[in-house]
UniProtKB/Swiss-Prot annotation:
Gene Ontology molecular-function annotations: histidine-tRNA ligase activity
HAMAP family (UniProt xref): HisZ (MF_00125)
Miscellaneous comment as given in the Swiss-Prot or TrEMBL entry: This function is generally fulfilled by the C-terminal part of HisG, which is missing in some bacteria such as this one.
Lineage: Bacteria, Bacillati, Cyanobacteriota, Cyanophyceae, Oscillatoriophycideae
Source organism superkingdom: Bacteria
Gene Ontology biological-process annotations: histidyl-tRNA aminoacylation; L-histidine biosynthetic process
Gene3D superfamilies: Bira Bifunctional Protein, Domain 2
Keyword DNA-binding: no
The gene coding this protein: hisZ
Descriptive protein name: ATP phosphoribosyltransferase regulatory subunit
């Protein structure tokens, strides 16, 4: 089996690398324009770090061999690792920390899905030690800026509120509450409808939660009709203020959907949660996800001091697939071509060929220069150049004199 990658792994060839590199570069430029600094965390972490106090299922983590000090794992996402880093290396900061990243993550597939992809690529940001309306608004507007910079148009921003959803779920007894939550997280209406409920009222409440999605004003009107605690009414009012803020702060109407049944797979979120979805090419893709996690940093603090945080990650694979079907995108459709091919015509001119190629490479602008490695006739070299879209050949004669030829 050494001639194949393991199940769930895949190789990226030059064109895909160039395209995903372009996506990453665009996103990093947007992050930097908003004042975010890149961080690099370890791919390998202690399993306890990665599980974020139980918010991330142990089965999700690809685990490595136990050591004498504990079990290691490959990160299934970046937020927990960045939270650990922030608490251990940036804990003295009382001002907001704006952090961005581009990295790979690893996840075990669900049971029964052998062969599903294990390694994923993400780019994202974390806004740490900052809470409140302005921080939430900054993150949502930054998401929109990222998607617009990439040239994507057919997308929606789905908003939810983890605290309010937990409150609405609190009427269900355990373990039914976990079953309802799982159905909401995976949009499994059939299973939700057929769960065993202690009363018809609870069944009706579960189905109502599933349907709390749509135009923000309409959904908030439905929620207002429910019997809510005072703390929940404050959340609803804050949500109204947030939606007003981002709608007034963006030059064009944002494609917002309010979905109070939205439950993220990772359970460390405490406030605003959101997903970015696209329906291009008649396929629904999740382009990104994020939310507020005001208790997570406290898990890694020696005195368990909490600090607010909010962030998001964008999924490079899904962004790439959407951009492939978007003709207006600036993503490259071909690998960069070689600008110059330098050919030593004799053994005596090989040193001169290397020197001339290096002279071309020393240009102030990026110039791609390759050296012909011999063994081909002049016509075979020209055929190769046409196939590879090489525009210019440089023939180095025996005396070291270059002769430039434009390929027709």
């Amino acid at each position: 089996m050494i001639h194949q990658p393991p199940a769930g792994a895949r190789d990226l060839l030059p064109l895909e690398v160039a395209q995903k590199g372009w996506i990453n570069d665009c996103l990093q430029q947007v992050f930097q324009r908003w004042g975010y600094q890149r961080i690099v965390t370890s791919t390998i972490e202690w399993l306890d770090t990665l599980m974020a106090g139980g918010a991330i299922e142990r089965s999700t983590v690809i685990q490595l061999q136990d050591t004498s000090e504990g079990t290691l794992g490959l990160r299934p996402e970046l937020t927990a690792s960045i939270a650990r880093t922030a608490v251990s290396r940036m804990a003295d900061s009382t001002y907001p920390q704006r952090i961005c990243y581009r990295a790979n993550v690893f996840r075990n597939p669900p049971p029964g899905y052998h062969g599903r992809q294990l390694e994923f690529y993400q780019a994202g940001v974390e806004l740490l030690f900052a809470g409140g309306l302005l921080a939430d608004g900054e993150i949502l507007l930054l998401v929109a800026d990222c998607l617009e910079t990439l040239g994507l148009t057919d997308w929606h921003l789905i908003l939810g509120e983890a605290g309010l959803t937990r409150s609405l779920l609190s009427v269900f007894p355990d373990p039914l509450r976990q079953q309802v939550r799982h159905c909401l997280a995976h949009l499994d209406y059939i299973t939700l409808e057929n769960l065993t409920y202690p009363s018809a009222d609870l069944r009706e409440r579960a189905l109502l939660l599933f349907d709390l999605r749509g135009n923000p004003a309409d959904v908030l009107s439905k929620v207002a009709s429910l019997e809510l605690e005072e703390s929940d009414r404050i959340i609803v009012n804050n949500f109204k203020s947030l939606i007003h803020l981002i709608e007034q702060s963006h030059p064009n109407p944002l494609p917002l959907i309010l979905d109070l049944s939205l439950v993220q797979t990772f359970d460390y979120y405490t406030g605003l949660v959101f997903k970015v979805v696209s329906s291009s090419d008649n396929q629904l893709r999740v382009l990104g996800q994020g939310g507020r996690y005001d208790q997570l940093l406290g898990l890694y603090h020696p005195q368990h001091q909490s600090a607010p945080g909010i962030g998001f990650s964008l999924n490079l694979e899904d962004l790439h697939l959407c951009l492939l079907s978007t003709s207006s995108s600036g993503m490259p459709r071909q690998i960069p071509v070689i600008d110059w091919l330098v050919i030593a015509q004799t053994t005596q001119s090989q040193v001169a060929a290397f020197n001339y190629a290096q002279l071309l490479r020393n240009s102030n602008t990026l110039v791609r220069v390759a050296l012909d490695l011999g063994g081909r006739s002049p016509e075979e070299i020209r055929d190769y150049a046409r196939t590879c879209r090489i525009k210019t050949l440089v023939w180095i004669g025996e005396d070291g004199t270059p002769r430039i030829e434009t390929v027709q």
